[in-house]
């Protein structure tokens, strides 16, 4: 076998050699015809040279060709069948009005094209400000046009006409957890849990069901088990109105009213369909774990996010930006201690561009968590935001029921430019609770956000809300109507966050404060302060230290925590750390740890922690953890042991499985709100995808998880690490998927080999220098004839037949099979077809 040459195509190599000889060619990259001076070519038979295919760059013979298209250097996610027509004795690319629409040209340009069609298409280079360049080797057309002539200005924005709903298929995204806790005295306990989402896609429709399972054991005997399906729903995008339609069990999504679980139908303008700079944000959740702990974020008792975290401060920053309303946070320590609090995910109600409207509406019946029963009352809710002026938006909404509850809200949002963003709204409720008279109440809310560009700081005063005693939310009314009494009548709440990075000091400051008061219950206040700084100590660079103080107030119990951490990088992938923590009992504990991630896909850590007495008595807690990222999922293992006290073991695995009519594959975890992309390598195994984030299985199927929706994404094959004798033609795939889609592409995969040979005609002569050698079936160029008939052929298959054409002559070659191939130069007889 011959080692692959890391080149593009031989034709490009020879072309570049010719282009470098300025005396032979002038303006090689232009679209003008040139004539080669054959006297400067050192060849035995100078006249037997045919370089006609290099004499005109940027042109193709009259006809239709399938090409990739780039518009202002941005790859489009489609192949276009483009025509070349003859104009002024030269061929030029000619686009139909439909193709101009797909490429994102404005209606004005398309109207001009429709008025000047030639054979049903328009030669776009008639517009002086439009230029094209054809890369024949890649069969790729680059179009350069004024940005003002294009509808979409964002480089990552793709016209809805190019969005891909994907193919039919099914998937399961799963998270598995197992734990074992064994105290020195007392009963052992075990727990097995899982949560995730299953789905089926058909066209633009997506069927989804969330699931969560929990099983507890005591000394191996089952104590309790619970299987819930919190949501079963059907949804689809409606690109024509930038909206998402949902039918089934879902949660109301609102920037004004509290969220609740319901069964029915909803329609919401989807800001993910808007350009990226108009999209919202999700909250950051911070806290401190005292041991190896499991952090669970849920809403309406539905698990949204779950993660195992080591001792010390943690931050969850990757929640979906679609979350609205109160989120419940629970930290379960390995010794059974549980800490809970709430955070608000309400963003400042969106400002809307002048003249535009955003909206959401839903109707149905409230549903108990788990979806096993419908509740009263029947409701309809809706809200909107209208861009009244450039910097002023009006918004409002209502909740109407067939019982004794109605709510109406109105507000205004201001873009104060350098002063930040401000919104204010008032909500009125009319409700009659059980055994009470009908009451009218009001709630007032203000939000403010400001980023100080000069200092890089961010201040958010989100969700200040005051409600009088008679104000009733829809959640409170649902609880009262269905005889649930464990709810609190909120009086006042607010959240303040401040973030500041001081570059000169390499110091980052983060402060958050949240307060809730109630008319009929005690108030709670949660706050945290975090300072972190990087510095150098002699040869030790980027040593980091952080100080975190937090107070969590829950059900009249204050939990104060203080944590100091110092981390010393040891090379580029190892870290030595020391942490000191003071808990609510004023006990001080110390932790020393070592973390190693020198292997790209594996990491491990060991630590010892305890207070002064525990270290003195050799009773410090010893912990170890191991994480392994694979193409099929992520494995996490951890264990803790404390002499004469307890030991615990924890394990988790998360991954996904996707199946379509083209095949199926296990793969890395894909977030349930994300799309995914299936690659079919035509049976080729171990094809690395997207920098080895995924690999094709034994059937040639691989799935790239967590592909962003409504954003142009390029997916690639790592051609540098292909298996031996495998070639990929279309190594880059560009796509724009709609939410939840299963994208699909089949690679032009060739299990092939290479040949170095000399082409010999029947009379012993050789074909002219520069002639293309092409595959007879695919017409793909496999090599170019050099001096003396020498040729390097790449991409040969056992059933390949090769053809050569020059002038009125042609011949074909039957190359030897790979099993019969010998080393050295091979004589390749070319049999005349004339």
What is each stretch, according to the model?
Residues 86-95, 319-324, 701-727, 738-739, ...:
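Short Pro-Gly-centered beta-turn/loop motif in secreted/extracellular proteins
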Residues 149, 178-182, 204, 213-217, ...:
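Transmembrane beta-strands of outer-membrane beta-barrel pores
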Residues 23, 27, 31-279, 584-658:
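Post-signal-peptide, soluble extracytosolic/periplasmic N-terminal scaffold domains
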Residues 81, 692-701, 778-790:
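Short, acidic Ser/Thr/Gly-rich low-complexity loop/linker segments typical of extracellular
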């Amino acid at each position: 076998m011959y080692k692959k040459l890391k080149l593009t195509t031989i034709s490009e190599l020879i072309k570049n050699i010719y282009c470098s000889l300025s005396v032979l060619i002038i303006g090689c990259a232009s679209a003008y015809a040139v004539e080669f001076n054959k006297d400067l070519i050192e060849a035995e038979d100078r006249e037997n040279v045919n370089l006609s295919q290099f004499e005109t760059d940027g042109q193709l013979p009259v006809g239709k060709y399938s090409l990739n298209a780039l518009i202002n250097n941005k790859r489009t996610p489609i192949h276009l069948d483009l025509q070349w027509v003859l104009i002024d004795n030269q061929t030029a690319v000619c686009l139909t009005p439909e193709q101009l629409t797909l490429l994102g040209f404005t209606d004005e340009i398309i109207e001009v094209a429709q008025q000047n069609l030639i054979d049903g298409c328009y030669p776009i280079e008639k517009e002086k400000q439009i230029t094209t360049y054809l890369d024949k080797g890649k069969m790729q057309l680059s179009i350069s046009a004024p940005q003002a002539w294009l509808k979409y200005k964002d480089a990552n924005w793709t016209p809805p006409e190019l969005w891909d709903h994907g193919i039919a298929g099914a998937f399961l995204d799963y998270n598995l957890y197992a734990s074992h806790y064994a105290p020195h005295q007392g009963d052992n306990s075990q727990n097995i849990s899982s949560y995730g989402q299953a789905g089926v896609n058909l066209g633009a429709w997506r069927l989804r069901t969330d699931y969560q399972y929990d099983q507890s054991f005591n000394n191996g005997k089952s104590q309790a088990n619970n299987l819930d399906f919190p949501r079963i729903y059907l949804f689809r995008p409606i690109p024509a109105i930038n909206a998402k339609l949902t039918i089934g069990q879902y949660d109301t999504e609102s920037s004004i009213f509290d969220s609740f679980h319901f069964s029915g139908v909803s329609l919401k303008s989807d800001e993910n369909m808007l350009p990226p700079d108009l999209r919202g944000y999700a909250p950051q959740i911070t806290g401190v774990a005292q041991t190896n702990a499991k952090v669970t974020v849920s809403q309406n008792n539905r698990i949204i996010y779950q993660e195992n975290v080591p001792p010390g401060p943690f931050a969850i920053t990757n929640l979906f930006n679609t979350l609205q309303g109160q989120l419940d946070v629970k930290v379960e320590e390995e010794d059974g201690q549980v800490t809970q609090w709430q955070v608000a995910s309400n963003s400042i109600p969106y400002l809307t561009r002048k003249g535009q409207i955003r909206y959401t509406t839903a109707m149905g019946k409230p549903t108990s968590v788990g979806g096993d029963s419908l509740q009263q009352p029947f409701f309809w809710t809706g809200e909107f935001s209208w861009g009244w002026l450039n910097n002023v938006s009006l918004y409002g909404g209502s909740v109407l029921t067939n019982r004794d509850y109605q709510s109406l809200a109105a507000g205004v949002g201001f873009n104060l430019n350098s002063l930040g963003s401000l919104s204010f709204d008032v909500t009125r409720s009319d409700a009659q609770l059980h055994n009470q008279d009908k009451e009218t109440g009001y709630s007032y809310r203000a939000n403010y956000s400001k980023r100080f560009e000069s200092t890089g700081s961010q201040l958010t005063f989100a969700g200040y809300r005051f409600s009088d005693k008679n104000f009733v939310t829809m959640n409170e009314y649902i609880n009262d109507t269905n005889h649930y009494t464990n709810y609190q009548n909120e009086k006042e709440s607010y959240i303040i966050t401040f973030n500041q990075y001081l570059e000169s000091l390499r110091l980052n400051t983060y402060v958050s404060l949240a307060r809730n008061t109630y008319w009929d219950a005690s108030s709670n206040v949660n706050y945290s302060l975090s300072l972190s700084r990087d510095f150098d100590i002699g040869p030790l660079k980027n040593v980091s230290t952080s100080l975190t103080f937090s107070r969590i107030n829950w059900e009249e119990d204050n939990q104060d925590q203080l944590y100091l951490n110092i981390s010393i990088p040891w090379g580029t992938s190892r870290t030595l750390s020391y942490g000191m923590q003071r808990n609510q009992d004023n006990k001080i504990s110390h932790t020393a740890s070592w973390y190693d991630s020198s292997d790209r896909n594996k990491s491990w850590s060991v630590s010892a922690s305890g207070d002064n007495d525990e270290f003195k008595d050799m009773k410090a807690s010893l912990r170890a953890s191991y994480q392994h990222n694979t193409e099929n999922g992520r494995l996490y293992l951890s264990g803790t042991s404390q002499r004469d006290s307890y030991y615990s073991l924890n394990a988790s695995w998360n991954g996904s499985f996707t199946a379509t009519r083209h095949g199926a594959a296990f793969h890395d975890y894909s977030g349930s709100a994300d799309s995914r992309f299936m690659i079919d390598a035509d049976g080729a195994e171990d094809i690395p995808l997207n920098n080895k984030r995924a690999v094709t299985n034994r059937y040639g199927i691989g799935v790239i998880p967590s592909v962003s929706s409504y954003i142009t994404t390029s997916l690639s094959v790592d051609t540098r690490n292909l298996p031996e004798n495998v070639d990929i033609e279309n190594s880059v795939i560009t796509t724009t998927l709609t939410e939840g889609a299963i994208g699909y592409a089949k690679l032009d995969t060739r299990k092939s080999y290479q040949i170095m040979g000399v082409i010999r005609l029947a009379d012993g002569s050789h074909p002219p220098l520069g002639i293309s050698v092409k595959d007879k079936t695919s017409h793909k160029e496999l090599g170019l004839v050099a001096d003396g008939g020498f040729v390097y052929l790449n991409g040969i298959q056992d059933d390949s037949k090769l053809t050569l054409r020059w002038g009125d002559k042609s011949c074909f070659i039957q190359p030897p099979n790979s099993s019969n191939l010998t080393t050295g130069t091979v004589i390749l007889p070319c049999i005349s077809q004339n």
